[in-house]
């Protein structure tokens, strides 16, 4: 017997749409580079509403796929620790969740104005200028 001809489109013809849960399949996601997935996931609006057409089990399964992708990103980061800047203790290097916490792009940044600001007119400046 032959299979039914109503098969889904081939994975390469399907596109990943973060707002459409039906595109959260490994067949589709496998063909996207990590950078493209990150950019598309970061572009999801904060107030995105998922239609009620999906069952709770299906929604939970798709959320688990997304979590697996996130853990995969953390694993890629962990395997490349020797090729990037070392993580600082500020980001809890040795806690229980450090293995799955992504730290891509995290840096210690301080506004330069805090450390380079000089205050003119302080009492010490007045003492120097009058002597």
Curated annotation (Swiss-Prot):
GO BP terms in the entry: viral process
Cellular component per GO, a single term: host cell nucleus
Transmembrane regions listed in the UniProt entry: none
Keywords: Capsid protein, Host nucleus, Virion
Localisation: Virion; Host nucleus
Entry keyword Ribosomal protein: no
Protein role: Participates in the assembly of the infectious particles by decorating the outer surface of the capsid shell and thus forming a layer between the capsid and the tegument. Complexes composed of the major capsid protein and small capsomere-interacting protein/SCP assemble together in the host cytoplasm and are translocated to the nucleus, where they accumulate and participate in capsid assembly.
Subunit structure: Interacts with the major capsid protein/MCP.
Name of the protein this chain belongs to: Small capsomere-interacting protein
Native source organism of the sequence: Gallid herpesvirus 2 (strain Chicken/Md5/ATCC VR-987) (GaHV-2)
């Amino acid at each position: 017997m032959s299979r039914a001809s109503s098969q889904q489109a081939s994975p390469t013809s399907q596109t990943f749409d973060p707002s459409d849960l039906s595109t959260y399949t490994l067949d589709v996601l496998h063909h996207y580079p990590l950078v493209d997935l990150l950019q598309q996931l970061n572009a999801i609006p904060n107030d995105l509403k998922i239609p009620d057409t999906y069952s709770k089990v299906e929604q939970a399964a798709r959320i688990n796929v997304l979590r697996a992708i996130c853990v995969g990103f953390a694993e890629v980061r962990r395997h490349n620790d020797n090729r990037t800047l070392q993580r600082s203790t500020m980001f809890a290097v040795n806690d229980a969740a450090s293995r799955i916490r992504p730290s891509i792009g995290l840096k210690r940044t301080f506004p330069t104005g805090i450390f380079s600001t000089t205050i003119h007119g302080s009492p010490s400046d007045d003492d120097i200028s009058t002597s």
